[in-house]
Amino acid sequence: MGYPGKNTKQYSSPKRRFEKSRIESERVLAITYGLRNKREIWRATEVLRKHRSGAREVLAMTSSIGEAPKTIARRDELVGTLQRYGLLGPDAAMDNILSLKVEDILERRLQTIVYRKGLARSPKQARQLITHGHIAINGQRVSVPSYMVSIAEEAGIMYYATSSLGDEANGERQRIMNQRA
């Protein structure tokens, strides 16, 4: 069974360590999304892998036993979770889950959304603002750049009230606003 306090690995490293095409594509993702290391990409890949395997499992259950209540409940749970995070549209099917990409997962990270909303000048600065406690979601300080933001929480992302960036006259905030304009 194992010791319950032991942390388990949240990602799986690539089978081929020095595959040139994979390294180049990961480098582009790391630069685009301001990631600290490749492990963050592998973690997002693992999240995607879990959702896709769940979708394949539901499709297999549907083809073998039909539309049983257990199958319907599992499908609704899986689709509902992905819709809540904005990875699927409101009229999505199981096939849409299989077509998701790593970029879709990375787009829902707090770091990316802070940059896309114009609260930071770059993805790296967005990461710094989050880790230093300048960003809040619905008034609650969040200091995890990899936090998956749901659709409901997205509108509540702003500077933390008591942060130095919470003041409109802050010099760095003025530079961020000028760059956005």
Swiss-Prot record:
SUPFAM superfamilies per UniProt: Alpha-L RNA-binding motif
Keywords: Ribonucleoprotein, Ribosomal protein, RNA-binding, rRNA-binding
Any one GO CC term of the record: small ribosomal subunit
A GO term, aspect molecular function: structural constituent of ribosome
A single BP term in Gene Ontology: translation
Pfam families, A to Z: S4
Top-level division of the source organism's lineage: Archaea
Positions of the S4 RNA-binding domain: 108-180
Keyword flag Ribosomal protein: yes
Function: One of the primary rRNA binding proteins, it binds directly to 16S rRNA where it nucleates assembly of the body of the 30S subunit.
Oligomer status and interactors: Part of the 30S ribosomal subunit. Contacts protein S5. The interaction surface between S4 and S5 is involved in control of translational fidelity.
Family: Belongs to the universal ribosomal protein uS4 family.
UniProt protein name: Small ribosomal subunit protein uS4
Organism, scientific name: Methanocorpusculum labreanum (strain ATCC 43576 / DSM 4855 / Z)
Gene that specifies this protein: rps4
